[in-house]
Protein backbone atom coordinates (compact mmCIF):
# COMPACT_ATOMS: atom_id res chain seq x y z
CA UNK A 1 0.00 0.00 0.00
CA UNK A 2 2.87 2.41 0.68
CA UNK A 3 4.09 1.82 -2.89
CA UNK A 4 0.67 2.62 -4.34
CA UNK A 5 0.34 5.65 -2.07
CA UNK A 6 3.76 6.93 -3.09
CA UNK A 7 2.94 6.61 -6.79
CA UNK A 8 0.30 9.32 -6.34
CA UNK A 9 2.98 11.82 -5.31
CA UNK A 10 5.13 12.81 -8.25
CA UNK A 11 5.59 15.26 -11.10
CA UNK A 12 1.89 16.17 -11.16
CA UNK A 13 2.05 17.66 -7.69
CA UNK A 14 5.63 18.95 -7.69
CA UNK A 15 5.67 20.48 -11.20
CA UNK A 16 2.29 20.19 -12.91
CA UNK A 17 0.62 22.18 -10.12
CA UNK A 18 2.45 25.33 -11.27
CA UNK A 19 0.32 25.52 -14.41
CA UNK A 20 -2.93 25.17 -12.51
CA UNK A 21 -1.87 27.92 -10.07
CA UNK A 22 -1.20 30.26 -13.01
CA UNK A 23 -4.72 29.70 -14.31
CA UNK A 24 -6.72 30.05 -11.10
CA UNK A 25 -4.51 31.76 -8.52
CA UNK A 26 -5.44 30.86 -4.92
CA UNK A 27 -8.81 29.62 -6.21
CA UNK A 28 -6.94 26.59 -7.54
CA UNK A 29 -7.87 25.11 -4.15
CA UNK A 30 -11.46 24.98 -5.44
CA UNK A 31 -10.23 23.13 -8.54
CA UNK A 32 -8.36 20.64 -6.35
CA UNK A 33 -11.42 20.16 -4.13
CA UNK A 34 -13.68 19.54 -7.15
CA UNK A 35 -11.34 17.00 -8.76
CA UNK A 36 -10.73 15.48 -5.33
CA UNK A 37 -14.48 14.88 -4.95
CA UNK A 38 -14.62 13.23 -8.38
CA UNK A 39 -11.66 11.02 -7.52
CA UNK A 40 -13.27 10.01 -4.22
CA UNK A 41 -16.48 9.00 -6.01
CA UNK A 42 -14.45 6.98 -8.52
CA UNK A 43 -12.43 5.30 -5.79
CA UNK A 44 -15.65 4.29 -4.03
CA UNK A 45 -17.01 2.87 -7.30
CA UNK A 46 -13.79 0.95 -7.93
CA UNK A 47 -13.73 -0.14 -4.29
CA UNK A 48 -17.27 -1.50 -4.42
CA UNK A 49 -16.51 -3.62 -7.49
CA UNK A 50 -13.15 -4.74 -6.09
CA UNK A 51 -14.71 -5.97 -2.84
CA UNK A 52 -17.20 -8.12 -4.74
CA UNK A 53 -14.78 -9.16 -7.52
CA UNK A 54 -11.13 -8.72 -6.43
CA UNK A 55 -8.94 -9.17 -9.51
CA UNK A 56 -5.50 -8.07 -10.68
CA UNK A 57 -5.54 -5.45 -13.43
CA UNK A 58 -9.04 -4.45 -12.35
CA UNK A 59 -9.53 -1.50 -14.75
CA UNK A 60 -9.57 -3.68 -17.86
CA UNK A 61 -11.21 -6.66 -16.13
CA UNK A 62 -14.23 -4.64 -15.00
CA UNK A 63 -14.63 -2.90 -18.35
CA UNK A 64 -14.53 -6.27 -20.09
CA UNK A 65 -17.01 -7.86 -17.66
CA UNK A 66 -19.53 -5.04 -17.27
CA UNK A 67 -19.29 -3.08 -20.55
CA UNK A 68 -18.00 -5.47 -23.20
CA UNK A 69 -14.91 -6.96 -24.85
CA UNK A 70 -14.16 -3.85 -26.94
CA UNK A 71 -14.23 -1.66 -23.82
CA UNK A 72 -12.00 -4.14 -22.00
CA UNK A 73 -9.55 -4.16 -24.90
CA UNK A 74 -9.42 -0.36 -25.08
CA UNK A 75 -9.13 0.06 -21.30
CA UNK A 76 -6.32 -2.49 -21.00
CA UNK A 77 -4.27 -1.04 -23.85
CA UNK A 78 -5.05 2.49 -22.68
CA UNK A 79 -3.66 1.75 -19.21
CA UNK A 80 -0.52 0.29 -20.78
CA UNK A 81 -0.23 3.38 -23.01
CA UNK A 82 -0.62 5.57 -19.92
CA UNK A 83 2.34 3.88 -18.21
CA UNK A 84 4.54 4.49 -21.26
CA UNK A 85 3.57 8.16 -21.67
CA UNK A 86 3.88 8.83 -17.92
CA UNK A 87 7.35 7.27 -18.12
CA UNK A 88 8.23 9.63 -20.97
CA UNK A 89 6.95 12.58 -18.98
CA UNK A 90 8.93 11.61 -15.87
CA UNK A 91 12.09 11.29 -17.98
CA UNK A 92 11.45 14.79 -19.34
CA UNK A 93 10.71 16.20 -15.88
CA UNK A 94 13.95 14.77 -14.50
CA UNK A 95 15.91 17.24 -16.63
CA UNK A 96 13.83 20.14 -15.31
CA UNK A 97 14.53 19.25 -11.69
CA UNK A 98 18.23 18.59 -12.29
CA UNK A 99 18.49 22.09 -13.81
CA UNK A 100 18.55 23.22 -10.16
CA UNK A 101 22.14 21.95 -9.92
CA UNK A 102 23.17 21.44 -13.56
CA UNK A 103 21.50 24.12 -15.70
CA UNK A 104 23.83 23.49 -18.65
CA UNK A 105 23.20 19.73 -18.79
CA UNK A 106 21.01 18.83 -21.82
CA UNK A 107 17.71 17.20 -20.88
CA UNK A 108 18.19 14.38 -23.36
CA UNK A 109 21.29 13.28 -21.42
CA UNK A 110 19.45 13.14 -18.08
CA UNK A 111 16.56 11.30 -19.75
CA UNK A 112 18.89 8.67 -21.23
CA UNK A 113 20.87 8.06 -18.03
CA UNK A 114 17.71 7.87 -15.91
CA UNK A 115 16.06 5.41 -18.29
CA UNK A 116 19.10 3.11 -18.27
CA UNK A 117 19.15 3.11 -14.46
CA UNK A 118 15.45 2.26 -14.19
CA UNK A 119 15.65 -0.53 -16.77
CA UNK A 120 18.65 -2.01 -14.96
CA UNK A 121 16.74 -1.94 -11.66
CA UNK A 122 13.71 -3.62 -13.23
CA UNK A 123 15.86 -6.42 -14.64
CA UNK A 124 16.48 -7.59 -11.07
CA UNK A 125 13.90 -9.70 -9.26
CA UNK A 126 10.58 -8.40 -7.93
CA UNK A 127 11.81 -8.24 -4.34
CA UNK A 128 14.46 -5.68 -5.30
CA UNK A 129 11.78 -3.55 -6.96
CA UNK A 130 9.39 -3.78 -4.00
CA UNK A 131 12.04 -2.92 -1.41
CA UNK A 132 13.41 0.00 -3.43
CA UNK A 133 9.97 1.40 -4.19
CA UNK A 134 8.80 1.10 -0.59
CA UNK A 135 11.64 3.27 0.70
CA UNK A 136 11.37 5.76 -2.16
CA UNK A 137 7.66 6.17 -1.41
CA UNK A 138 8.30 6.56 2.30
CA UNK A 139 10.84 9.32 1.63
CA UNK A 140 8.36 11.20 -0.57
CA UNK A 141 5.56 11.04 1.97
CA UNK A 142 7.76 12.07 4.90
CA UNK A 143 9.30 14.99 2.97
CA UNK A 144 5.93 16.36 1.88
CA UNK A 145 4.60 16.22 5.44
CA UNK A 146 7.69 18.09 6.69
CA UNK A 147 7.26 20.65 3.91
CA UNK A 148 3.66 21.32 4.94
CA UNK A 149 4.55 21.57 8.64
CA UNK A 150 7.44 23.96 7.88
CA UNK A 151 5.19 26.07 5.66
CA UNK A 152 2.49 26.52 8.25
CA UNK A 153 5.11 27.31 10.88
CA UNK A 154 6.32 30.19 8.69
CA UNK A 155 2.74 31.35 8.11
CA UNK A 156 2.14 31.51 11.87
CA UNK A 157 5.40 33.37 12.51
CA UNK A 158 7.24 30.50 14.18
CA UNK A 159 10.27 31.02 11.93
CA UNK A 160 12.96 33.73 11.97
CA UNK A 161 10.72 36.32 10.25
CA UNK A 162 7.33 37.85 10.98
CA UNK A 163 4.17 35.85 10.37
CA UNK A 164 3.15 35.77 6.71
CA UNK A 165 -0.48 34.99 7.54
CA UNK A 166 -2.93 35.22 4.63
CA UNK A 167 -1.70 38.21 2.63
CA UNK A 168 -0.61 36.09 -0.33
CA UNK A 169 -4.14 34.67 -0.55
CA UNK A 170 -6.02 37.97 -0.32
CA UNK A 171 -3.62 40.26 -2.21
CA UNK A 172 -2.46 40.10 -5.86
CA UNK A 173 -5.97 40.18 -7.31
CA UNK A 174 -7.76 38.43 -4.48
CA UNK A 175 -8.69 34.81 -3.94
CA UNK A 176 -10.17 34.34 -7.44
CA UNK A 177 -8.13 36.72 -9.64
CA UNK A 178 -9.13 35.10 -12.95
CA UNK A 179 -12.73 34.38 -12.08
CA UNK A 180 -14.68 31.18 -12.64
CA UNK A 181 -12.96 30.60 -15.99
CA UNK A 182 -9.59 30.33 -14.23
CA UNK A 183 -10.98 27.70 -11.85
CA UNK A 184 -12.37 25.74 -14.81
CA UNK A 185 -9.21 25.95 -16.92
CA UNK A 186 -7.16 24.74 -13.94
CA UNK A 187 -9.22 21.54 -13.83
CA UNK A 188 -7.21 20.05 -16.71
CA UNK A 189 -3.81 20.29 -15.00
CA UNK A 190 -5.32 19.32 -11.64
CA UNK A 191 -6.78 16.17 -13.21
CA UNK A 192 -3.24 15.22 -14.23
CA UNK A 193 -2.05 15.79 -10.67
CA UNK A 194 -4.52 13.22 -9.31
CA UNK A 195 -3.70 10.52 -11.86
CA UNK A 196 -1.54 8.23 -9.74
CA UNK A 197 -3.96 7.93 -6.85
CA UNK A 198 -6.03 5.28 -8.65
CA UNK A 199 -3.22 2.77 -8.18
CA UNK A 200 -4.21 2.64 -4.49
CA UNK A 201 -7.42 0.91 -5.49
CA UNK A 202 -5.70 -1.63 -7.74
CA UNK A 203 -3.08 -2.42 -5.11
CA UNK A 204 -5.79 -2.98 -2.51
CA UNK A 205 -7.52 -5.35 -4.94
CA UNK A 206 -4.45 -7.59 -4.81
CA UNK A 207 -4.31 -7.60 -0.99
CA UNK A 208 -4.61 -10.81 1.04
CA UNK A 209 -7.96 -9.76 2.52
CA UNK A 210 -9.67 -7.44 0.00
CA UNK A 211 -12.92 -7.13 1.99
CA UNK A 212 -11.12 -5.30 4.77
CA UNK A 213 -8.14 -3.84 2.88
CA UNK A 214 -10.16 -2.14 0.13
CA UNK A 215 -12.56 -0.10 2.33
CA UNK A 216 -9.64 0.95 4.53
CA UNK A 217 -7.54 2.04 1.55
CA UNK A 218 -10.36 3.83 -0.27
CA UNK A 219 -11.64 5.71 2.78
CA UNK A 220 -8.11 6.92 3.52
CA UNK A 221 -8.12 8.71 0.15
CA UNK A 222 -10.10 11.58 1.70
CA UNK A 223 -7.32 12.32 4.17
CA UNK A 224 -4.66 11.98 1.50
CA UNK A 225 -6.49 14.47 -0.71
CA UNK A 226 -6.86 16.93 2.18
CA UNK A 227 -3.32 16.60 3.51
CA UNK A 228 -1.12 16.08 0.47
CA UNK A 229 -2.99 17.87 -2.29
CA UNK A 230 -4.94 20.66 -0.60
CA UNK A 231 -2.38 20.92 2.21
CA UNK A 232 0.62 20.99 -0.10
CA UNK A 233 -0.83 23.48 -2.58
CA UNK A 234 -2.30 25.58 0.23
CA UNK A 235 1.15 25.87 1.79
CA UNK A 236 2.60 27.12 -1.51
CA UNK A 237 -0.13 29.72 -1.90
CA UNK A 238 0.32 30.99 1.65
CA UNK A 239 4.09 31.35 1.39
CA UNK A 240 4.45 33.19 -1.93
CA UNK A 241 2.35 35.28 -4.35
CA UNK A 242 0.60 33.03 -6.86
CA UNK A 243 1.56 35.28 -9.79
CA UNK A 244 5.28 34.69 -9.18
CA UNK A 245 5.02 30.99 -10.04
CA UNK A 246 6.62 29.81 -13.27
CA UNK A 247 5.17 26.85 -15.19
CA UNK A 248 8.62 25.40 -15.95
CA UNK A 249 9.79 25.06 -12.35
CA UNK A 250 8.53 23.50 -9.15
CA UNK A 251 6.50 25.93 -7.03
CA UNK A 252 7.68 24.05 -3.94
CA UNK A 253 11.35 24.72 -4.68
CA UNK A 254 10.71 28.30 -5.73
CA UNK A 255 8.84 29.09 -2.53
CA UNK A 256 11.41 27.57 -0.17
CA UNK A 257 14.20 29.44 -1.95
CA UNK A 258 12.20 32.66 -1.88
CA UNK A 259 11.59 32.61 1.87
CA UNK A 260 15.27 32.07 2.62
CA UNK A 261 15.31 28.32 3.20
CA UNK A 262 17.93 27.46 0.58
CA UNK A 263 19.13 24.25 2.30
CA UNK A 264 15.53 23.07 2.68
CA UNK A 265 14.92 23.81 -1.01
CA UNK A 266 17.99 21.76 -1.93
CA UNK A 267 16.87 18.88 0.27
CA UNK A 268 13.36 18.99 -1.18
CA UNK A 269 14.71 18.97 -4.72
CA UNK A 270 16.60 15.79 -3.85
CA UNK A 271 13.30 14.31 -2.69
CA UNK A 272 11.55 15.46 -5.88
CA UNK A 273 14.23 13.78 -7.99
CA UNK A 274 13.62 10.65 -5.91
CA UNK A 275 9.87 11.06 -6.52
CA UNK A 276 10.35 11.30 -10.29
CA UNK A 277 12.59 8.23 -10.28
CA UNK A 278 10.06 6.40 -8.10
CA UNK A 279 7.09 7.06 -10.40
CA UNK A 280 9.16 6.15 -13.47
CA UNK A 281 10.23 2.95 -11.74
CA UNK A 282 6.62 2.05 -10.94
CA UNK A 283 5.38 2.83 -14.46
CA UNK A 284 8.16 0.73 -16.01
CA UNK A 285 7.33 -2.16 -13.70
CA UNK A 286 3.55 -2.06 -14.11
CA UNK A 287 3.61 -1.28 -17.84
CA UNK A 288 5.72 -4.34 -18.64
CA UNK A 289 3.38 -6.56 -16.65
CA UNK A 290 0.29 -5.06 -18.24
CA UNK A 291 1.75 -5.81 -21.69
CA UNK A 292 2.58 -9.35 -20.57
CA UNK A 293 -1.00 -9.87 -19.34
CA UNK A 294 -2.43 -8.49 -22.59
CA UNK A 295 -0.29 -11.01 -24.48
CA UNK A 296 -1.44 -13.86 -22.23
CA UNK A 297 -5.07 -12.90 -22.94
CA UNK A 298 -4.43 -12.95 -26.68
CA UNK A 299 -4.69 -9.16 -27.00
CA UNK A 300 -1.00 -8.52 -27.76
CA UNK A 301 1.76 -10.41 -29.64
CA UNK A 302 2.54 -13.71 -27.89
CA UNK A 303 6.24 -12.85 -27.63
CA UNK A 304 5.45 -10.39 -24.85
CA UNK A 305 3.95 -13.15 -22.70
CA UNK A 306 7.39 -14.73 -22.25
CA UNK A 307 9.20 -14.43 -18.92
CA UNK A 308 12.79 -15.02 -17.86
CA UNK A 309 14.02 -17.69 -15.45
CA UNK A 310 13.38 -15.17 -12.66
CA UNK A 311 9.78 -14.71 -13.81
CA UNK A 312 10.46 -11.25 -15.25
CA UNK A 313 8.65 -10.11 -18.43
CA UNK A 314 11.96 -9.15 -20.03
CA UNK A 315 10.74 -8.76 -23.62
CA UNK A 316 7.80 -6.61 -22.57
CA UNK A 317 10.09 -4.55 -20.34
CA UNK A 318 12.64 -3.89 -23.08
CA UNK A 319 9.89 -3.03 -25.57
CA UNK A 320 8.39 -0.50 -23.14
CA UNK A 321 11.84 0.93 -22.44
CA UNK A 322 12.46 1.37 -26.17
CA UNK A 323 9.20 3.29 -26.53
CA UNK A 324 9.99 5.47 -23.51
CA UNK A 325 13.43 6.03 -25.01
CA UNK A 326 11.93 7.94 -27.93
CA UNK A 327 11.54 10.85 -25.53
CA UNK A 328 15.35 11.10 -25.43
CA UNK A 329 15.30 11.96 -29.14
CA UNK A 330 12.35 14.32 -28.68
CA UNK A 331 14.18 16.17 -25.90
CA UNK A 332 17.23 16.45 -28.14
CA UNK A 333 15.28 18.25 -30.87
CA UNK A 334 12.44 19.89 -28.90
CA UNK A 335 13.76 20.51 -25.39
CA UNK A 336 11.29 22.53 -23.33
CA UNK A 337 8.30 21.77 -25.58
CA UNK A 338 7.58 18.13 -24.81
CA UNK A 339 6.21 18.28 -21.26
CA UNK A 340 2.93 20.08 -22.09
CA UNK A 341 2.08 17.67 -24.94
CA UNK A 342 2.75 14.59 -22.80
CA UNK A 343 0.72 16.07 -19.94
CA UNK A 344 -2.26 16.61 -22.25
CA UNK A 345 -2.10 13.02 -23.53
CA UNK A 346 -1.96 11.68 -19.97
CA UNK A 347 -4.99 13.71 -18.89
CA UNK A 348 -6.94 12.16 -21.75
CA UNK A 349 -5.82 8.61 -20.97
CA UNK A 350 -6.71 9.13 -17.31
CA UNK A 351 -10.22 10.21 -18.31
CA UNK A 352 -10.64 7.03 -20.36
CA UNK A 353 -9.62 4.90 -17.38
CA UNK A 354 -11.92 6.86 -15.10
CA UNK A 355 -14.81 6.61 -17.56
CA UNK A 356 -14.26 2.86 -17.73
CA UNK A 357 -14.57 2.62 -13.94
CA UNK A 358 -17.65 4.85 -13.86
CA UNK A 359 -19.59 3.09 -16.63
CA UNK A 360 -18.54 -0.36 -15.38
CA UNK A 361 -19.96 0.53 -11.99
CA UNK A 362 -23.26 1.67 -13.52
CA UNK A 363 -23.68 -1.71 -15.21
CA UNK A 364 -22.32 -3.60 -12.19
CA UNK A 365 -25.07 -2.18 -9.99
CA UNK A 366 -27.72 -3.48 -12.39
CA UNK A 367 -26.59 -7.05 -11.70
CA UNK A 368 -25.59 -6.68 -8.03
CA UNK A 369 -28.32 -5.18 -5.88
CA UNK A 370 -26.68 -5.70 -2.49
CA UNK A 371 -23.12 -4.49 -1.98
CA UNK A 372 -20.83 -4.88 1.03
CA UNK A 373 -19.08 -1.56 0.35
CA UNK A 374 -21.64 0.46 -1.61
CA UNK A 375 -20.53 3.65 -3.37
CA UNK A 376 -22.48 6.72 -2.22
CA UNK A 377 -24.98 8.71 -4.30
CA UNK A 378 -25.50 6.04 -6.94
CA UNK A 379 -26.35 6.72 -9.76
CA UNK A 380 -26.13 10.52 -9.38
CA UNK A 381 -22.38 10.36 -8.61
CA UNK A 382 -21.78 8.35 -11.79
CA UNK A 383 -23.50 10.92 -13.98
CA UNK A 384 -21.73 13.78 -12.20
CA UNK A 385 -18.41 12.09 -12.98
CA UNK A 386 -19.37 11.56 -16.63
CA UNK A 387 -20.34 15.24 -16.93
CA UNK A 388 -16.95 16.14 -15.44
CA UNK A 389 -15.10 13.99 -18.01
CA UNK A 390 -16.93 15.74 -20.86
CA UNK A 391 -16.17 19.15 -19.33
CA UNK A 392 -12.43 18.44 -19.11
CA UNK A 393 -12.32 17.19 -22.70
CA UNK A 394 -14.07 20.38 -23.86
CA UNK A 395 -11.59 22.48 -21.87
CA UNK A 396 -8.70 20.60 -23.49
CA UNK A 397 -10.12 21.57 -26.88
CA UNK A 398 -10.38 25.23 -25.83
CA UNK A 399 -6.88 25.57 -24.35
CA UNK A 400 -4.21 25.72 -27.12
CA UNK A 401 -1.51 23.89 -25.14
CA UNK A 402 -3.72 20.79 -24.77
CA UNK A 403 -5.06 20.48 -28.33
CA UNK A 404 -2.17 18.45 -29.76
CA UNK A 405 -2.37 16.00 -26.88
CA UNK A 406 -6.13 15.70 -27.32
CA UNK A 407 -5.73 15.03 -31.06
CA UNK A 408 -3.06 12.37 -30.39
CA UNK A 409 -5.28 10.66 -27.85
CA UNK A 410 -8.28 10.70 -30.21
CA UNK A 411 -6.24 8.99 -32.91
CA UNK A 412 -4.97 6.40 -30.44
CA UNK A 413 -8.49 5.47 -29.28
CA UNK A 414 -9.79 5.22 -32.85
CA UNK A 415 -6.93 2.89 -33.76
CA UNK A 416 -7.56 0.72 -30.68
CA UNK A 417 -11.27 0.52 -31.40
CA UNK A 418 -10.67 -0.54 -35.01
CA UNK A 419 -8.08 -3.15 -34.00
CA UNK A 420 -10.43 -4.56 -31.36
CA UNK A 421 -13.37 -4.80 -33.75
CA UNK A 422 -11.20 -6.36 -36.47
CA UNK A 423 -9.76 -8.91 -34.03
CA UNK A 424 -13.22 -9.80 -32.75
CA UNK A 425 -14.61 -10.36 -36.25
CA UNK A 426 -11.65 -12.53 -37.25
CA UNK A 427 -12.27 -14.77 -34.22
CA UNK A 428 -15.93 -15.10 -35.09
Which role fits each region the language model picked out?
Residues 135-136, 303-314, 351-404:
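C-terminal membrane-solvent junction of multi-pass transporters and transport-like membrane proteins
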Residues 60-64, 90-111, 143-146, 204-212, ...:
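Helix-loop-helix connectors at the membrane interface of multi-pass transporters/channels
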Residues 61-62, 68, 100, 217-283, ...:
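TM-loop-TM module centered on a large, flexible mid-protein loop between adjacent transmembrane helices
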Residues 14, 55, 78-91, 194-207, ...:
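Membrane-helix boundary/coupling elements in multi-pass transport proteins
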Residues 15-110, 114, 221-230, 405-416:
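Extracellular loop-to-transmembrane helix junctions
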Residues 121, 143-150, 291, 343-371, ...:
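Hydrophobic alpha-helical segments of multi-pass membrane transport proteins
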Residues 103-106, 138-270:
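Helix-loop-helix junctions that connect adjacent transmembrane segments
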Residues 1-17, 21-27, 40-44, 56, ...:
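Membrane-interface "cap" regions at the ends of multi-pass membrane proteins
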Amino acid sequence: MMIAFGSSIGTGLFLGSAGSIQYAGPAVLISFALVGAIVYFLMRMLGEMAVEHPVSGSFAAYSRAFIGPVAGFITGWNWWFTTVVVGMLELTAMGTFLDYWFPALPHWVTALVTLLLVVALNLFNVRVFATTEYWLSLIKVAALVLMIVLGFALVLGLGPDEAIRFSNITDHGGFMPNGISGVLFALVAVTFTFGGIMSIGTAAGEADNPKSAIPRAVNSVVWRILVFYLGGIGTILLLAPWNEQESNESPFIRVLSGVGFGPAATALNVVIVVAVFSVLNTMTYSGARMLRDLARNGQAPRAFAATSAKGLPTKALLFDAALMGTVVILNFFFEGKIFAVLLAIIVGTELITWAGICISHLNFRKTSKSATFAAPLYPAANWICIAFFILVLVLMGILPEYRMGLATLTGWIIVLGLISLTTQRSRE
